[in-house]
Design a protein with these regions (language model features):
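Conserved small/polar residues in nucleotide/adenosyl-binding loops
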Residues: 157-163
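Short catalytic helix/loop segments, enriched in acidic residues and glycine
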Residues: 22-37
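Conserved anionic group-binding/transfer micro-motifs
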Residues: 32-36, 53, 100, 154-156
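Phosphate-coordination/substrate-recognition cap region in phosphate-metabolizing enzymes
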Residues: 39-147, 161
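Glycine-rich phosphate-binding "P-loop"
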Residues: 25, 142-153
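Extreme N-terminal starter segment of soluble prokaryotic enzymes
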Residues: 1-4
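Glycine-rich N-terminal loop/short-helix segment of MobA-like nucleotidyltransferase
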Residues: 11-26
Length: 166
């Protein structure tokens, strides 16, 4: 029987700082690297075989998968798909979540985070964070690069996964 394993990347340095990350390409924290290793150990303990793997373009996800595969003693190519990139948080990108909640209020904060079709405000076209996205944007159709996202477009984007072996 086939099995589907879904893993989230390990803790990133911005997760540790409680910041909205989205498409900003930040590294894993040491804790995140350990979490990835533990995921690999659990997969091994459960004797689950991996035949194919996918990850987003984000280095924290690629590093998580690489650590898992290394822990499993697997040296296999994996597929990258920008469609698996984390949700884009628009103008909230880089902000501390607790400070943002205090500033905009609990209700609006929840809408931006959990609402199906309410996206945070657009990221400004002159945002410093846009430079961080440029390497990620290679191979992504320009009309598909978001400046913010609600959960709705993210869930639809994840339904189709082209392959790009690494």
């Amino acid at each position: 029987m086939s099995k589907l394993i879904l893993t989230r990347h390990g803790q990133s340095i911005w997760n540790a700082e409680n910041r909205f990350t989205g498409w900003v390409d930040v590294d894993l924290s040491e804790k995140g690297k350990e979490e990835a290793k533990k995921s690999g150990e659990l997969i091994s303990e459960l004797n689950i075989k991996i035949d194919i793997s996918y990850t987003s373009y984000l280095k924290r996800a690629i590093e998580t998968l690489t650590i898992i595969l290394k822990t499993l003693n697997l040296s296999m190519k994996f597929n990258t798909a920008w469609e698996l990139n984390e949700r884009h948080y628009g103008s909230l990108t880089g902000l501390n979540k607790e400070e943002t909640k205090k500033k905009i209020g609990e209700e609006q904060f929840k809408k931006y985070r959990r609402s199906w079709d309410v996206a945070p405000p657009l990221m400004a076209k002159d945002s410093n964070y846009l430079e961080n996205f440029s390497p990620l944007n290679d191979g992504i159709p320009k009309n598909k690069i978001p400046f913010t996202e609600s959960l709705k477009p993210v869930s639809y984007t994840h339904l189709t996964l082209p392959t790009n072996d690494r």
